């Protein structure tokens, strides 16, 4: 559909421009040398400034951990959050967080925008994409609301009523040929139908009754009826065959299949509202419009309607609730009038005018409704748009990693010694957190650390714990020996 292609093409073009700007980093009018960092640059956190493992000072043992301080590794399949007792998010929560993360990852950080002023073009494209997505979403909601309402248009259905006469053949071998008979056909088609799909003739009607002359065919064989059922097979026309060699007057009663169902209004209500046959919702809406126009709604209690003389004659009460109107309308709504066509089945061979045409108004589905439905169900260009989104996220992540590497190199070039010391302190803190090591080994290896006031209390506590431990061991050994 044209609207679907336009919407999908606009989104795809916007995504492509976003990705091209991020990859190439050049916008019209930009100097050739001014480029954003290329995606092919190495990624990942900055490596260690030293090569190999650090040397061990003479006289010091290699750094290690006591077995009691080591933390047991979690079992296979258990995450670090589970091993630490933290709640693990469920699948829907992960999907929502991933969606929020993706939306946030498409925005360039402020520090990168300050570093590369040309990146404002990407932010402008991102804002345009957001507006485009919001516009498409609003249009989709409008289309969904429009599809909930009946969308009909008036068309002309031309009926062709024809008949053929088969005279009797005395020398015929079968009984059918020896008796004169006639055949009546009822067919039709839409005039100027733009749709390529031809609609069956019977689909326009709920019932069809052909009433023949009762004097010729008797009270039991003068009616031919067709009524729609849930299992009805649609057909392009109806035909009736009867024996006879006399012209027959017949009456065709055609009941249109209204969708949604329509009703004929009571004559008094029809004069009041100016409607003859309409759907129930249209009748209620017209009645409400009449109430508002004539200010019949109660000024104190909006739920009630104070009827005028016409209103009281129709509903037979001076005052009623608006919620009661649909129930009271049931007695005032009648089945719609059928289409009545009088036709003469002629058996005169000299009568050449045996086909009659009639044009009737029918309601058909708006062709735009099918296009609107296909637009809502269409998934065209979705895979390509998703692929471009993934590339944009990867490119933004690459730019962030390159910014981290640039900051590292820039800080190192400004103050190599201070930056290396800060880096070592940071890595030392991270190592202590990762290995769960308590204390500070660098301070603990110096003698001044043990001359502080807390050392005397620590020694007393240590010996007290050892004495208690030995006492328990001796008591257990004595109990075992006595038994």
Swiss-Prot record:
Residues 26-102 are annotated as: Disordered. InterPro entries: SMARCD3_SWIB_dom, SWIB_domain, SWIB_MDM2_dom_sf, SWIB_MDM2_domain. The modification Phosphoserine is found at residue 178. Residues 78-87 have a biased composition (Low complexity). GO terms for molecular function: chromatin binding; DNA-binding transcription factor binding; nuclear receptor binding; signaling receptor binding; transcription coactivator activity; transcription coregulator activity; transcription coregulator binding. GO terms for cellular component: brahma complex; chromatin; cytoplasm; nBAF complex; npBAF complex; nucleoplasm; nucleus; SWI/SNF complex. Isoform 2 and isoform 1 are expressed in brain, heart, kidney, placenta, prostate, salivary gland, spleen, testis, thyroid, trachea and uterus. Isoform 1 is also expressed in skeletal muscle and adipose tissue. One of its GO terms (biological process) is regulation of G0 to G1 transition. It comes from the Eukaryota. The lineage of its organism: Eukaryota, Metazoa, Chordata, Craniata, Vertebrata. Pfam families: SWIB. The modification N-acetylalanine is found at residue 2. Involved in transcriptional activation and repression of select genes by chromatin remodeling (alteration of DNA-nucleosome topology). Component of SWI/SNF chromatin remodeling complexes that carry out key enzymatic activities, changing chromatin structure by altering DNA-histone contacts within a nucleosome in an ATP-dependent manner. Stimulates nuclear receptor mediated transcription. Belongs to the neural progenitors-specific chromatin remodeling complex (npBAF complex) and the neuron-specific chromatin remodeling complex (nBAF complex). Component of the multiprotein chromatin-remodeling complexes SWI/SNF: SWI/SNF-A (BAF), SWI/SNF-B (PBAF) and related complexes. The canonical complex contains a catalytic subunit (either SMARCA4/BRG1/BAF190A or SMARCA2/BRM/BAF190B) and at least SMARCE1, ACTL6A/BAF53, SMARCC1/BAF155, SMARCC2/BAF170, and SMARCB1/SNF5/BAF47. Other subunits specific to each of the complexes may also be present permitting several possible combinations developmentally and tissue specific. It is found in: Nucleus. Belongs to the SMARCD family. This is SWI/SNF-related matrix-associated actin-dependent regulator of chromatin subfamily D member 3. Residues 258-335 form the SWIB/MDM2 domain. Keywords: Acetylation, Chromatin regulator, Neurogenesis, Nucleus, Phosphoprotein, Transcription, Transcription regulation.
């Amino acid at each position: 559909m044209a609207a679907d292609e336009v919407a999908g093409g606009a989104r795809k073009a916007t995504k492509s421009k976003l990705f091209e700007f991020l990859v190439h980093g050049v916008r019209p009018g930009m100097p050739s040398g001014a480029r954003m960092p290329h995606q092919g640059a190495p990624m990942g956190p900055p490596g260690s400034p030293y090569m190999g493992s650090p040397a061990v000072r003479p006289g010091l043992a290699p750094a290690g951990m006591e077995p009691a301080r080591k933390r047991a590794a979690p079992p296979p399949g258990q995450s670090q959050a589970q091993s630490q007792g933290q709640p693990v998010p469920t699948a829907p929560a992960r999907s929502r967080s991933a969606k929020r993360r993706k939306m946030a990852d498409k925005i360039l950080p402020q520090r990168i925008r300050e570093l590369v002023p040309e990146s404002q073009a990407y932010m402008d494209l991102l804002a345009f994409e957001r507006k485009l997505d919001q516009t498409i979403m609003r249009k989709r909601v409008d289309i969904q609301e429009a599809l909930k309402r009946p969308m009909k248009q008036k068309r002309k259905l031309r009926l062709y009523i024809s008949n053929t006469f088969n005279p009797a053949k005395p020398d015929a071998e079968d009984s059918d040929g020896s008796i004169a008979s006639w055949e009546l056909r009822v067919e039709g088609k839409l005039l100027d139908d733009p749709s390529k799909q031809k609609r069956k003739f019977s689909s326009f009607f709920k019932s069809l009754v052909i009433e023949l002359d009762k004097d010729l065919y008797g009270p039991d064989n003068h009616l031919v009826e067709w009524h729609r059922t849930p299992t009805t097979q649609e057909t392009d026309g109806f035909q009736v065959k009867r024996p006879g060699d006399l012209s027959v007057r017949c009456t065709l009663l055609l009941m249109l299949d209204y969708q949604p169902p329509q009703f004929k209004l009571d004559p008094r209500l029809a004069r009041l509202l100016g409607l003859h046959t309409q759907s129930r919702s249209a009748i209620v809406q017209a009645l409400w419009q009449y109430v508002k126009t004539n200010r019949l709604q109660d000024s104190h209690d909006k739920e009630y309607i104070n009827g005028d003389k016409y209103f009281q004659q129709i509903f037979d009460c001076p005052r009623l609730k608006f919620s009661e109107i649909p129930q009271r309308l049931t007695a005032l709504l009648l089945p719609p009038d059928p289409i009545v066509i009088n036709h003469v089945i002629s058996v005169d061979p000299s009568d050449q005018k045996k086909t009659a045409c009639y044009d009737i108004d029918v309601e058909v589905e708006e062709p735009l409704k099918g296009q609107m439905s296909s637009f809502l169900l269409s998934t065209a260009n979705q895979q390509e748009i998703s692929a471009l989104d993934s590339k944009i996220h990867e490119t933004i992540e690459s730019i962030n990693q390159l910014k981290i590497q640039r900051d590292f190199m820039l800080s190192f070039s400004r103050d190599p010694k201070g930056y290396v010391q800060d880096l070592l302190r940071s890595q030392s803190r991270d190592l202590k957190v990762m290995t769960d090591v308590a204390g500070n080994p660098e301070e603990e290896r110096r003698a001044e650390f043990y001359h502080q006031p807390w050392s005397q209390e620590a020694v007393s506590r240590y010996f007290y714990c050892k004495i208690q431990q030995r006492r328990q061991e001796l008591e257990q050994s004595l109990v075992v020996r006595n038994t």
